[in-house]
From Swiss-Prot:
SUPFAM superfamilies: ARM repeat (SSF48371). One of its GO terms (biological process) is proteasomal ubiquitin-independent protein catabolic process. GO terms for cellular component: cytosol; nuclear speck; nucleus; spermatoproteasome complex. It comes from Danio rerio. Homodimer. Interacts with the 20S and 26S proteasomes. Coiled coil: none annotated. Keywords: Cytoplasm, DNA damage, DNA repair, Nucleus, Proteasome, Repeat. This is Proteasome activator complex subunit 4B. InterPro entries: ARM-like, ARM-type_fold, Blm10_mid, HEAT_PSME4, PSME4, PSME4_C. The keyword Repeat applies. It is found in: Cytoplasm, Cytosol; Nucleus; Nucleus speckle. Residues 1632-1720 are annotated as: Bromodomain-like (BRDL).
Amino acid sequence: MKKEQAEILGFVPQKEIVYNKLLPYADQLDRESNDILAQIKGNLGRAVQLRELWPGVLFWTRKLSTYLRLYGRKFSKEDHVLFIKLLYELVTIPKLEISMMQSFARLLVNLLKKKELLSRDDLELPWRPLYDLYESILYSKTEHLGLNWFPNSVENVLKTLVKSCRVPESATQEMLDEWRPLLCPFDVTMQKAIGYFELFLPTIMPPEQHDKGFKLWFDEMMNLWVSVQNLPAWEGNLVNLFARLANDNIGYVNWDPYIPKIFTRILRSFNLPVGTSQMVVPRYLTNSYDIGHVVLWISSMLGGPQNQSQKQLNGLFSSIASFYHPSNNGRWLMKLMKLLQRLPASIVRRLHRERYKKPCWITPVPSTHKLTDQDVTDFVESMKQPVLMAMFSKTGSMDAAQALQNLALMRPELVIPPVLEKTYPAMETLTEPHQLTATLSCMIGMARSLLSGGRHYPEGPAHVLPLLMRALPGVDPNDFSKCMITFQFIATFTTLVPLVDCSSALHDKNDLTEMERELCSASAEFEDFVLQFMDRCFALIDSSTLEQTREETETEKMTHLESLVELGLSSTFSTILTQCSMEIFKVALEKVFNFATTNIFETRVAGRMVADMCRAASKCHPAESLRLFVPHCCNAITHLTANEDVSNEEELDKELLWNLQLLSEVTRVDGEKLLPYRTQLVQILQLTLRLRCKQGYSLACNLLHHVLRSTALIYPTDYCSVPGGFSRPLQEYLPIKDWGRPGDLWNLEIQWHVPSTEETAFVFYVLDLLLQPELQRLQRYAQGEQEMSRDDVLQSLCIVQHCLLGAGSMLPPLDGSTVTGLVPSMVNLEETKLYIGVDYDQSRENYREAVCKVMRQLLHYILEHSEDDTKSLFAIIKIISDLMHFKGSHKHEFDSRWKSFTLVKKSMENRLHGKKQHIRALLIDRVLLQHEMRKLLVEGCEYKTVHQDLLRDLLRLSTSTYSQVRSKAQNVLFTALGTYNFCCRDITPRVLEFLEPTRTDVTQQQFKGALYCLLGNHCGVCLANLHDWDCIAQTWPAIVRSGLSSAMSLEKPSIVRLFDDLADKVHRQYETIGIDFTVPENAVFLGRSITNSSQPTPHMGTPEDQELQQGLAVQQAKNREAEQKYEKLVKDLLECLDDRDLPWKFEHIAIGFLSLLLRDDYPLPAPAVFFFVQSLNHDALVVRKMAIAAVAGILKQLKRPRKKIPVNPCDISGVTEPEELEAGDRPGNDWLQYHSESLPNSQQDWDAFCFVEKTHWGYYSWPKKLMVYAPAAEQPKDLAPDTMSEREAIINDHFTDPTFINQLIKFLSLEDRKGKDKFNPRRFCLFKGLFRNYSDAFLPVLKPHMERLANDSHESTQRCVAEIIAGLIRGSKHWSFGKVEALWAFLIPLMRTALSNITVETYADWGTCVATACESRDPRKLHWLLEMLMECPLSGEGGSFVDACHLYVLQGGLAQQEWRVPELLHRLLSYLEPKLTQVYKNVRERIGSVLTYIFMIDVALPYTLPTKSPHIAEFTERILSQLKPLIEGDEEIQNHVVEENGVGEQDERTQAIKLLKTVLKWLMASAGRSFSTPVPQQLQLLPLLFKIAPVENDDSYDELKRDAKTCLSLMSQGLLYPEQIPMVLAVLHEIAGSSSWHARYSVLTYLQTMVFYNLFTILSSEQCVQGVRALVIRLLEDEQLEVREMAATTLSGFLQCNFLAMDSSMQTHFEALCKTRLPKKRKRDVGSVMDTIPSVDLVRRHAGVLGLSACILSSPYDVPTWMPQLLMDLSAHLNDTQPIEMTVKKTLSNFRRTHHDNWLEHKQQFTDDQLVVLTDLLVSPCYYA
């Protein structure tokens, strides 16, 4: 097969779409595809060499995408590589228009997709061009200023592209060199660098290259990940990178040392609620890991000699299992369900790769690490429990069903039986229908695994019949969802099973296995099943007849639910009949025929369902069925229409309608079988098409449509699960062997219906007989020669439309001359013709053209004479649509069928073996879809004059009087616009005519229609926004000018809304249009390689030299033209804006359009600059806002480039960098830090200083070339008025004009929305640009204003001055020393004034101002500012509030400087330390936050040296010594501090309490922000916190107690390193001996959270587990009742999440405690039941009972083997004294509650004697009184 094909093609295809080989015309496709490929290669190569990106290259790359959809990768490997290289060159053209880049990128992704087709030897692509492209778009320096407009989708397209590329082996090192210097954890560059690593680092390399691959970075990244404790945003990216690495290199990466840490972090990432009162750090929710990658990582680590991961995975599932129980719900549930659903799928994918996939160049998994059968079994076992629980989850059963489908593929014998155990009872129950829905949907997914049985699960098939029979009651008219799932269930099972009675084989054959004999005898029930199913359906139909269900008025449509039931019913019935043997079919046919012919149904609901069932029958075996139905119906109809008057009646007899309906459905069968009945059918059509009654003739039209369609279309006729059906005798063929058998793609034996000559003749005979006369009548009517009533016209149109629908596939498409001159191109833009199995007969009448001609005449006649005949217009619009596009199928039907095909495929696929092992019916469906797709692929059709006429008619309809007509016509118009090449350019001017202000004859309806035409629909073309200068230059000015049209009225809300939508859509969809269309030489060279390639040889060779020169000239001319068009568009919009009569709305729209036209590669024309600068002082706020953004962008355009030079850091520091990686503060980067003794304070120091502005350089490692700004002498001079360009002069003139500035500042200091305003970054950019470009030229004018604003404490004035100051400081980056010094001399006093006027509303703005001013600036340049802020933040002058604000502002500045100001941080800390005992809460909170930032730099990251900034450890030591009085004292700590500072110094203790309050604020603030937690230091504070934290939740507690509780909650969730755990446990043990029971109680709550959030890390050390266990068991015997109960709860939790195991030693320990003897009560103490102080014995006995109770409650959803005995032990204590009795009762009541649901299966675990006792206990009422 392959050989012959290679001979025809001349090459071996890379990978083609196999379904093409099964089409009825498959033998023609190789020639066709080679033709098209040669055409694509020739034209694409030529277009690239002629440098014609648009339309040439774009047109032919689109054709290439279409080729991929039609034939797959059907080209040679050489061509494949050439295409990829060419597209790679095109994608990475610098300055390429973004929409072109995206369209090339999507195609490139498609070409790179199947990794296995091209190895690294075949193809390597450089990574840098792609990185430059990605960087320029995702981190664009100009996008935020509005100089570039990118679509939202671009990010994902580029990411996918990067992931698909293959890079050379040297790339890893180059990437590390490029991005390592960005790894500064305090900076945003960290996120960027890790993001790049995740995206770009290659992980598929052969093992011998691993040293040049992941081994270069693995340890470094892994250590970084392990050492970060507080989940920064980039941690997720690292996880994604590790997951990809693991998946691509199974067996080559040793994960073992990290496994406990990995699983601990995965568990933390679910954010599950633990314990009683938990505070969640918000960052944990936003930055948690992506489940898809977690799943990939886990599934790649499983297996291997130790299989460590499986042990951890067991632990993971047992620790979260109970969260899956349906009674639990929360926002974490979605994540857990996703884990459940995806993990089995991921393992199946891995097994497929290891065992079944064809080997290719990618390194296979080494056999030591492949999953063994035991590994798979262990995996399935570990997932079974959670999945079975999740079946009934609140989120629905879909996730569980998908999980079970995959688990059943691997181990059917483990998962199917337990699901069956739940399914059978669910089928019996009447009260819980949701159980049925859930179990059936799970069974559907497992159907194939159940049926195929196999050696592991041979008893599977035996369940089929019992399941099918029991499912029948689910067909229930009263419960819709039950009905649907039952249909789906029955259909799924019957598709897989031939319904043939094989019982007779028991006598004939003696070689059957036991199982086969059982199935043979069971199959005798099939007939019974089919008949019972039919009875159920009949009952369903009877209960849904129309009369019962609704009023007369709503009769038109079935309700949505009814139509779904109809669909379910008909498809299930049709599946059943397809799978029946002939014997069973005949019985069923008889039954359905009798039902249909002995009753008369109304045609809307019941009638449709019955007719569907009859259609299903006749489709399966047409000959047998038609023999019954056709004569019956024809006789009935002939008989009923015998009377003359019938044809004129308005209402027809029900029986007549029903027979017509029945006939119209049963004729939807194989056309060949219809031919014997053709005379009868034609006779009926002649009788009924002219009936007066609309319902009557509509049914007749359906009959006409179906008869034509059955004979004219190409379609498969059988969908049986086995080719050839089941009619062979049992001796030679035993159907039970085919249960669950997949279709064999290579022997599908599809039976196609291809129209024979006889059928074709019949089709045209019908058209001549029935269509011709209608066309003639309509034509005479349209010419005014014959009167017709509207109803008659409509009836004729109905017949015409149904003829088109029926015979459309045989009528050749409309043809004629092409419309030329729309787009100049040097490349051939022809359409590709696809063969779809029909050879059009040119000798016959071309009805498509005839209909077209008549319809156009009729349309014009109706629009002239009776425009209100909307029904006829609707019909004509439908017909026009079909004339243009219909070749036998509709696009929307195709789309929904493709969707449902994918769904069915998913629900029944076998991902384990792969190889397209779908069932036969599905494969046939897919082949048919391939055929339909070929019919519908119409993009890039030539635009012919016929189409032009039809489009103009549609436009006329789209702007007609009635809105419904307009909207229907518009939808057809939009589809057409997307179909024909360049037709938009022809239509747009016609649409715009309606908006022309000079025209007075335009009605409001036409105006609105035209606007809708511009707007487009949500999926089609939007004429207002075609990415092309010609179109935009026409439409935008026209939209603005339409504001002057007489038809425009702003009083009509609908018109106002239309303009809003239009402007909004343009803004949303606009992408920067290219101006530069240069094609680089590399691409031209590759174009030449494509035209010179062979197999297939391109249609045309390399262009001649003169053509190439002409191409270059045209391309240069095109660039110039683009610039001119751009300038003209700007000019036109400005002209519109000059018009004084333009309404304000249109002025705003125009300014909006203008602001979209700012670009970073071409300066805005001067008049527009003038306009925007003037608009800064416009009256309307909207305009001012747009102007501010625009002027900021213009200033960026005018920014002059600064010269940069490389420097060598080692020369400056005089230190050579060490060989090994050393990050952090080291001698080599000390010169970057702030040293107050060596600041540049004079001109020469300043000039000699090497300033490094970006904060991250030098922290982690140095870049290959460190670029810094060249000395001032080499930089461009300041702007002088005589050297300015026109644009620069305009800005200069305005900003040196005092009146302009006056007005501007007045506007800027107005408030916009009260209380909502914030520091505005746009305004900041404006001022930054002014001071950057013009140095200090505008200061003299602005100074007086700034001084005035700073003195005014109003919110908006303060904000305004803050924005100016931030812009000024950042803008002064390159000023000379003299100017900078003068600037600070002015600013420092100004800022002092302003900061003393700070208010609640403005402190955030001042913080932003200073933070913005310090961002990415060398601290040594800002030393004036930093020193001013450091002066005295807590002077106390302005009261506590001003102090807090000063701190906030200072913090903003220092935080931006990160690690470069250790000296300032030390100074600040020593300044703050004595003030930590501050009284005021707001100052305390602020100090807490500032401390977090001071210690932020003290991180424990790998390869990082200890910081020079303050260390937490030393600070904590000092604090602890001050807190001594509290730690040592034993009495309760009360918050009894007097808030005013009393006279004299208070005692140490009061001071310590005040200090503690601040320290708590600091601990709370740092929990979510710092990277690493100083555990050893925090531990020393724990005893103190435990002492204070209250036990109950009560908001009335004072701040101190609440904070202490919060701190404990946050600390207990912290991630611990293994070496820290023993330290924590030691402290907890110590506190457990404390005298305060509150502290002992809190130890337990702390322990619960800490253990769960560090589960696997603690489990990996046996010693720690024993420590925890000892602690809990010790506290079980605490003297305080509350502590004992909490200990029991804790123990139960630890047992439940499998942290501790229930072993015999624990059981005997508790049983022994229970037997503690209690002292006898004395008789005379009857009054006092108990001594108030519990005796030691009572406590011990209670501890034992609590222990047993904890064990019982730790298994809420099942009954382990040890449980019955413990329940017996417990019951012995029912009559003990309190509190024991209470505990026992509570336990029993809980046990009853949690085990009640599944008591039937739990009962099995107990012996009869135990059950007697238990029933007594659980039922006797007194215990629950």
